[in-house]
């Protein structure tokens, strides 16, 4: 979920598997409990069985934290969200828990009339009241400043204190939002609702203010080509987009991302778009669609000594490109895309996870069978990747089913391409880099998921730095 990534970036905390749940997971848990006999043969109902499962998920974290944030997706009135709203209603009645319910609404602006319309917000709150929930704070998304009369009207008709109606206006940068919310009093309204005294919990916005200053004082402009197949929906690469921005801020650079659809561009138009780019990045993905365009982009970066960054599938395709065009291995490819005896990338059948061996074959279900989550990698000293991380052992998040075939490693190293990062057991290549190239790195993991605005990922900082100096 996109919002989960925003929470990670703004709180500087990495989410756990238990930090997100879907309706499907809730219903699956209920059905499993019924099969086990936990309900003693009683008829399964949305209330109490489904709502109790939702409450159990929420309560599981409350014991260990001072404040927990829970976001319910969707729109008030959606059938899918009703059990979640009911669970929230029940939890709100628990006298041992202080809570604050924030309702996000949209305030449309009619340019022809020159006024903001609060009626949709009033009806939205009415829908919530029908579900037995009274919001404590209303966040008002708007493209225009919200006048005092509109705020007073929302307060009056929605049973919310005037100081708890918070404008949430568009900002030039998402990293201005904490300062804007504080300006309109969100922090004080929230603390009061949760039973805290605002004067005892002063908000430290200095890091965010300093970040805004760095953004405004950027000296360089750098053009980065991101060659993928999901570029029509840029939010598909949201974490990647933000990580590049973070790397740019750290280098005092404004990153101009050129989104290139690898499936729709022919080789001639692709080369035209890549020309003039300071760096080329191939992101992760699945499936054969669009891979030829990505491979051609990697070849262009390699032959023209342009900084190249391959992530997950991007690293695997770099291995394929080098195998085909440098090592001259006939029919070199990935078993994900082509049946060949020269699979330089193949399906993993087993790997170590927390001291346990996980196994899978080609007939296994795809769901839940990936090498998924945080895994360690050991970096070779005197490598570029080691100089970037400044650590021998790193931990990064993974999401893949295919891995570089170890049988070909020596052939790559003989041509100046070596695997400078491996899994702790030495079986799975994690990092590819080139001795001949100024900056040519492929990683099997997803570093973008750990980049933060106040703590940018070192790989993206190094990549943008190399692109500036190109």
Q: Where do the PLM segments sit?
A:
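Flexible phosphate-sensing "switch/lid" loops adjacent to ATP/NTP-binding sites
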Residues: 1-253, 263-279, 286-287, 293-300, ...
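C-terminal and late-domain segments of enzyme folds
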Residues: 365, 372-470
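Short, hydrophobic alpha-helical segments
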Residues: 158, 190-198, 326-330, 463-470
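Cysteine-nucleophile active-site neighborhood
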Residues: 273-375, 382-384, 453, 459-468
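Beta-strand->loop->alpha-helix junctions that form or flank phosphate-binding loops
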Residues: 163-170, 258, 422-425
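Catalytic cores of nucleotide-enabled group-transfer and carboxylate-activating enzymes in metabolic
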Residues: 116, 151, 208-216, 257-258, ...
């Amino acid at each position: 979920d996109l919002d989960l990534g925003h929470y990670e970036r703004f709180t500087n905390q990495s989410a756990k598997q238990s930090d997100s749940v879907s309706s499907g997971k809730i219903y699956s848990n209920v059905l499993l409990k019924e099969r086990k006999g936990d309900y003693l043969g009683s008829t399964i109902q949305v209330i109490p069985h489904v709502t109790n499962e939702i409450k159990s998920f929420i309560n599981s974290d409350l014991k260990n934290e001072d404040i927990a944030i829970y976001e319910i997706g969707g729109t008030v009135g959606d059938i899918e969200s009703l059990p979640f709203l009911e669970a929230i209603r029940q939890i709100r009645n628990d006298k041992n828990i202080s809570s604050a319910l924030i309702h996000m609404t949209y305030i449309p602006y009619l340019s022809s009339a020159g006024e903001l319309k609060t009626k949709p917000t009033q009806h939205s709150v009415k829908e919530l009241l029908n579900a037995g929930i009274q919001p404590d704070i209303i966040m008002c998304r708007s493209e225009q400043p919200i006048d005092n009369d509109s705020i007073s009207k929302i307060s009056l008709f929605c049973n919310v204190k005037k100081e708890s109606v918070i404008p949430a206006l568009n900002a030039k940068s998402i990293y201005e939002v904490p300062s804007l919310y504080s300006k309109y009093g969100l922090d004080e309204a929230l603390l009061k609702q949760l039973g805290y005294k605002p004067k005892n919990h002063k908000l430290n916005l200095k890091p965010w203010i300093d970040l805004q200053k760095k953004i405004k004082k950027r000296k360089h402009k750098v053009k980065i080509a991101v060659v993928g197949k999901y570029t029509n929906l840029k939010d598909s690469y949201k974490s990647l987009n933000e990580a590049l921005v973070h790397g740019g801020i750290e280098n005092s650079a404004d990153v101009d991302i050129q989104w290139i659809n690898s499936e729709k561009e022919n080789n001639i138009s692709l080369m035209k778009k890549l020309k003039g780019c300071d760096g080329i990045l191939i992101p992760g993905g699945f499936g054969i669609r669009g891979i030829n365009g990505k491979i051609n982009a990697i070849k262009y970066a390699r032959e023209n000594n342009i900084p190249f960054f391959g992530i997950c599938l991007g690293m695997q395709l770099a291995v394929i490109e080098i195998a085909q065009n440098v090592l001259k291995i006939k029919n070199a490819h990935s078993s994900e895309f082509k049946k060949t005896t020269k699979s330089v990338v193949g399906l993993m059948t087993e790997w170590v996870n927390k001291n346990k061996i996980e196994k899978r074959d080609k007939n296994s279900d795809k769901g839940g069978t990936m090498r998924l989550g945080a895994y360690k990698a050991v970096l070779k000293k005197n490598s570029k990747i080691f100089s970037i991380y400044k650590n021998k052992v790193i931990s990064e998040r993974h999401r893949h089913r295919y891995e570089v075939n170890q049988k070909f490693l020596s052939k790559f190293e003989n041509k100046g391409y070596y695997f400078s990062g491996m899994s702790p057991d030495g079986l799975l290549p994690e990092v590819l880099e080139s001795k001949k190239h100024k900056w040519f790195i492929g990683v099997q993991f997803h570093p973008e998921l750990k980049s933060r605005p106040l703590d940018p990922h070192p790989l993206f900082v190094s990549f943008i730095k190399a692109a500036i100096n190109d």
